[in-house]
């Protein structure tokens, strides 16, 4: 009996995984399609911006593109004289700067819209799976049945983590923060996969779509395994090998809870909730960590280092720690009766409200609506969290108060997610890891897109220099210390421990 082409493809994927050689599986490229780059027209904004420089009286014309953008470099031609280097755009936090063009996700913060490759996030959460969404983000279109099957199979076959990486995780303290573990392990993968490192194999290595796809599948497959190992390390337990017979979220829960029992199967309803949460967190255009990934990738660094850097950015409490802050806030409020006092404290700027407002959304975060509806499903299985009543009442109070409405402060994705994670038994320090696992799909989509973008250049922002203009070196004995020296210029005093004092009190012969 002749082996079908699809079976051959699967065998090729498995062979490529086992060999870890330079030759990559042809099956990946065959079954993965490229994106449809057509974009629905929103109405052309093309034109010309005329600038009158009142310093010189000169007029300048700056082209405006179809999508309403201007090139920052065009402002360099606006000068006052030969010594002038031209205008720079000062934009702290990149509030109105677009360093890339992307077709991966679309956000309209005023209308509360999030779309993955044109698909509304609500539709994807209701109907799709995380791996299908990851494929969509990566390749631009929803997969066919055979493409999805082969994609899921390939990810499953690359879910095992090198023993050396597991040894690194096991060597860390039991109380090591799991995000620190994830950053370290993801970075270590670069060492264990030198075949995919441009610094070792040449800058053109990622010109091969097969090489790219293999790294994508490796990271998507290994991320939950590393995360599970970090979780188990906190509990003092050894890592559990992934199962090859379970869906993505189910497999993650299996590694957390099976205790090595190969017949264990997680609750399918909880696994589905986690899968939906993964979908909601998979991508969110140029957020801090995704921008970090593209920034690093622009240098030509290997994808593992770029992703590790992105996870490091997500580790920051201003980016990935908001749902933990929400839990702390709700716990401090305690009961529904304390909400009016808390609201007044927020309005008087004596208290801080976490989980409301967003850099982009000036409307209800569409992801928050989906997550709110997931809460009852989780509570029906594991029991109701008493803080959910506080959360619902706080949301109602805020959305009926002109102070918050006028400022367009609405619940964001973090407002309810922490309650769900806690109800599912995850400790607060693990919440950001649950954010990082699915966001790998977004990081990798942007990495892949940047490789194909002809406008990609190594990122090297300008600065506005505010320091001393010029001074000359003075020998140390001739320097004068004045009383008005800036406090920031002085070396901070480092406290000496008693152990150091004991050692210094001794002598050596």
Swiss-Prot record:
Gene Ontology cellular-component annotations: cytosol; peroxisome
GO function term, MF aspect, one: citrate (Si)-synthase activity
Alphabetic keyword roster: Peroxisome, Transferase, Transit peptide, Tricarboxylic acid cycle
Annotated pathway: Carbohydrate metabolism; tricarboxylic acid cycle; isocitrate from oxaloacetate: step 1/2
Region (Disordered): 485-509
Major site of localization recorded for this protein: other
Classification via InterPro entries: Citrate_synth-like_lrg_a-sub, Citrate_synth-like_sm_a-sub, Citrate_synthase, Citrate_synthase_AS, Citrate_synthase_sf
Biased composition (Basic residues): 500-509
Reaction catalysed by this enzyme: oxaloacetate + acetyl-CoA + H2O = citrate + CoA + H(+)
Family, as annotated: Belongs to the citrate synthase family.
Comment field (misc): Citrate synthase is found in nearly all cells capable of oxidative metabolism.
Protein name: Citrate synthase 3, peroxisomal
Organism: Arabidopsis thaliana
Encoding gene per record: CSY3
